[in-house]
Amino acid sequence: MLAKRIVPCLDVKEGKVVKGVQFRNHEIVGDIVPLAKRYAEEGADELVFYDITASAHDRVIDKSWISRVAEKIDIPFCVAGGIRTIEQAREKLAFGADKISINSPALTDPSLIARLQDEFGRQCIVIGIDSYYDASSDSYRVKQFTGDEAATKDTQWYTQDWVEEVQKQGCGEIVLNVMNQDGVRQGYDIKQLSMIRSICDVPLIASGGAGTMAHFRDVFSRANVDAALAASVFHKGIIDIQELKQYLKDNQIAVRV
């Protein structure tokens, strides 16, 4: 059995790590490189960095800190933010990132996924999906440009359909960001994640809702995701990564300790 991964997420805005609630009201939580180093030392399996306003502001993720992170940590890390071209992706990988993640630019041009996959291989192409549960229609919809509240907009895509489309285009991994759960620490959306798991043939990462160690146990055992991403519980010291991994191991979840 493949070990489940614990993935701290660092949202980056203007060179600082920030965290919001339901993608709004972001506050500064620390500096990029020290936080990355801390999580690597605490036993994280991987890190994800999102430059949250890059796509909305029509720019690309700042490369200056990518090489500094690569020098300080020895675990894989993924970067995201406004990557729209092969050249931009190549630059980020050359600076030391192991994977690149595409979200809003893929919604604008789905064929970007296939082009990136052809150039770099599926294994380093991650698709982030910001999924919002619309109670009025009882449906899951994909939103775009979510890093800037003023720029966020609805798309034509239902989440299930977009998951199938990005796989068809050649993505290697999917991060499902459940917007309704983001930052509220009430648990992952097991229902939605289980539904997506049933149509997802690539590794699936759960994002949004972690508040306790039991939430991680539940998302692994009930939704069968490959990794669980979280931010505020790690930034605020609510959960220690080593203690979390021991807890999961004690609950028969395969993890690297």
From Swiss-Prot:
InterPro entries named among the record's database cross-references: Aldolase_TIM, His_biosynth, HisF, IGPS_HisA/HisF, RibuloseP-bd_barrel
Subcellular location(s) per record: Cytoplasm
Catalytic activity: 5-[(5-phospho-1-deoxy-D-ribulos-1-ylimino)methylamino]-1-(5-phospho-beta-D-ribosyl)imidazole-4-carboxamide + L-glutamine = D-erythro-1-(imidazol-4-yl)glycerol 3-phosphate + 5-amino-1-(5-phospho-beta-D-ribosyl)imidazole-4-carboxamide + L-glutamate + H(+)
Gene Ontology biological-process annotations: L-histidine biosynthetic process
SUPFAM superfamilies named among the record's database cross-references: Ribulose-phoshate binding barrel
UniProtKB keywords: Amino-acid biosynthesis, Cytoplasm, Histidine biosynthesis, Lyase
CDD domains recorded: HisF (cd04731)
Function as written in the Swiss-Prot or TrEMBL entry: IGPS catalyzes the conversion of PRFAR and glutamine to IGP, AICAR and glutamate. The HisF subunit catalyzes the cyclization activity that produces IGP and AICAR from PRFAR using the ammonia provided by the HisH subunit.
Protein name: Imidazole glycerol phosphate synthase subunit HisF
Organism: Shewanella halifaxensis (strain HAW-EB4)
